Curated annotation (Swiss-Prot):
Belongs to the LptE lipoprotein family. Residues 167-193 are annotated as: Disordered. It comes from Escherichia coli O81 (strain ED1a). It is found in: Cell outer membrane. Component of the lipopolysaccharide transport and assembly complex. Interacts with LptD. Transmembrane segments: none annotated. Its main location: membrane. This is LPS-assembly lipoprotein LptE. It comes from the Bacteria. The lineage of its organism: Bacteria, Pseudomonadati, Pseudomonadota, Gammaproteobacteria, Enterobacterales. Keywords: Cell outer membrane, Lipoprotein, Membrane, Palmitate, Signal. Residues 1-18 form the signal peptide. Together with LptD, is involved in the assembly of lipopolysaccharide (LPS) at the surface of the outer membrane. Required for the proper assembly of LptD. Binds LPS and may serve as the LPS recognition site at the outer membrane. It is a lipid-anchor.
Length: 193
């Protein structure tokens, strides 16, 4: 019985390791982005902390913004906006439920290449109980913190697509340069008198 349990456990480990299964909330960050500079207007703000945490969870080494290295990709965090819309109302017309929408803009600068804009949008809703103002504020703070974490996860998940776009632009550049080199010069075939 013990032998069978060991065999089944070993088989389960081999199957999950062999099929490319990964732990939840981890992303295959491209090898060219394993060392990065995180640039933010608010380096100790909630979004910067969430992105820094996600980058470290995904094995990315972060360099100081003032580093002298110019060959390292840079993730620049931009504007964050949080909008709050009414989702439902009570019979008396007061708001019963809000939907919050967080939009985060960022850019990835790959030295010698291009600047790639990325963005993330996170939606959450919460109930507005007017009789529990303090609890409502605490719940809203927790929801906003969770939204920052989800936005950071979305931004990190978009890094592999940036690498793919970078490779695609390289291929397009090489194909256009080879096309212009391979095109023969125009030769006139008219006979003059």
């Amino acid at each position: 019985m013990r032998y069978l349990a060991t065999l089944l456990l070993s088989l389960a480990v081999l199957i999950t390791a062999g099929c490319g299964w990964h732990l939840r909330d981890t992303t295959q960050v491209p090898s060219t982005m394993k060392v990065m500079i995180l640039d933010s207007g608010d380096p100790n703000g909630p979004l910067s902390r969430a992105v820094r945490n996600q980058l470290r969870l995904n094995g990315v080494e972060l360099l100081d913004k003032e580093t002298t290295r110019k060959d390292v990709p840079s993730l620049r965090l931009g504007k964050v906006s949080i909008a709050k819309d009414t989702a439902s109302v009570f019979r008396n017309g007061q708001t019963a439920e809000y939907q919050m929408i967080m939009t985060v803009n960022a850019t990835v600068l790959i030295p010698g290449r291009d600047i790639y804009p990325i963005s993330a949008k996170v939606f959450r809703s919460f109930f507005d109980n007017p009789q529990m103002a303090l609890a409502k504020d605490n719940e809203q703070d927790m929801i906003v913190k969770e939204m920052y974490d989800r936005a950071a996860e979305q931004l990190i998940r978009k890094l592999p697509s940036i690498r793919a776009a970078d490779i695609r632009s390289d291929e397009e550049q090489t194909s256009t340069t080879t096309d212009t080199l391979a095109t023969p010069a125009r030769v006139s075939t008219t006979l003059g008198n």
